[in-house]
């Protein structure tokens, strides 16, 4: 599947309030088509070493109006990514602290624990979505710049991508830390997350709890209702699964690794089904 179609599908599946925050890939392609392909003799010459050390190194010199419009839109897109990403990160810092406070004050009522777990799962899913947002937009930029270089003969892709690597939206270290903190919270609150599936391994007791061990010391009193929450119906879950599917399609599209290749996500099991187990998502919902 072509990247444009994959991106379009992802935008349709994502959170409604996020849909206008992704790369305007179609608009960039339209601007690209307005440019007249340059013949070999009219293409920019590679700078010599002496030229590259000169004062006049403005990459926009010699560009047509259409090319300048394209570059301007790219810069606007970067600003859009950064603004949205930083805003989300700042919100997540506050939300994580509130969640930790909520967990610390939580009583052992079944309803309260179910609500806390759902909040953590949704928060985890939204952060994974933002990590994928970063990777998808990076990929889109690399692909549209490749098309630009091919059409104009210019060589702006490498310097532009080098700039992108330093942008806030591309830096997901803090997000990855938050994701792992959420997983750690779930493991502490609900040790049963470490098992494969409560419905497969556990036995319901007369009190409506689920027993996962043979020793009384290993009796995990998890509300049976908890295993029946259909997290796969969660909007966060649907969006996240869709995003991961798109990224898998993108990565499988080329076996060649280069400076422009999509960087791997931090190693936290996000690209396979193991991350679902970490947040206690049941793939086979109890009937």
Swiss-Prot record:
CDD domains the UniProt entry points to: SPX_AtSPX1_like
Presence of the UniProt keyword Nucleus in the record: yes
GO cellular component, one term: nucleus
Descriptive protein name: SPX domain-containing protein 2
Primary location recorded for the protein, binned into one broad class: nucleus
Knockout consequences: No effect on Pi accumulation, due to the redundancy with SPX1. Spx1 and spx2 double mutants have an increased root-to-shoot growth ratio and a reduced rot hair size when grown in Pi-sufficient conditions.
Protein induction: Up-regulated under phosphate starvation.
Region named Disordered: 36-61, 194-213
Pfam families assigned: SPX (PF03105)
Basic and acidic residues bias (residue ranges): 36-50
TM region(s), chain numbering: none
Reported function: May inhibit PHR1 DNA-binding activity in a Pi-dependent manner.
